[in-house]
């Protein structure tokens, strides 16, 4: 973990293709990207990276939800070792509601979760059917820098 006091961050973008349903393979891609970006403070992954996109009805299966959560928790523990934090898209079950989420993994923990607010429901996108809309999130404090963490369409509008 890089802990230098600063108001700047080195961010690596992991523009990778995940495979729908291949939780273990997608988690391994995240590990390799973290190792490749050892110089960065944060590695950012695509929406729903752990599940693969679009996961459609697969995210409704409890075993799949549990597998995604387990992979995120394992990746979080791995951030206790030196290296960058991870910002990873994943389905996340919270109080009986399933969210399209992004998890900030740092210092060995899931240090923040943000849920997608603006769920699309057109063309191939059917997120309103499978995900709950999250509350409008505020920024997170990450290593002394305030970060907004919108997911996809959450950043498209003025609100």
Protein language model regions, located:
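Enzyme catalytic cores with a strong preference for nitrogen-chemistry domains
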Residues: 1-159
């Amino acid at each position: 973990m890089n802990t230098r006091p600063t108001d700047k961050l080195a961010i690596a973008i992991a523009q990778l293709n995940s495979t729908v349903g291949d939780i273990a393979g997608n988690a391994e891609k995240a590990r390799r990207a973290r190792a490749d970006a050892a110089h960065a403070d944060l590695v950012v992954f695509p929406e729903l990276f752990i599940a693969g996109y679009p996961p459609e009805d697969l995210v409704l299966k409890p075993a799949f939800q549990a597998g995604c959560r387990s992979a995120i928790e394992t990746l979080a523990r791995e951030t206790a070792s030196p290296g960058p934090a991870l910002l990873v898209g994943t389905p996340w079950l919270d109080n009986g509601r399933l969210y399209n989420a992004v998890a900030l993994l740092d210092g060995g923990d899931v240090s923040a979760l943000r849920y997608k607010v603006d769920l699309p429901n057109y063309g191939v996108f059917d997120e309103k059917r499978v995900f709950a809309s999250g509350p409008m999130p505020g920024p997170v404090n990450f290593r002394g820098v305030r970060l907004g963490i919108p997911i996809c369409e959450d950043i498209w509008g003025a609100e």
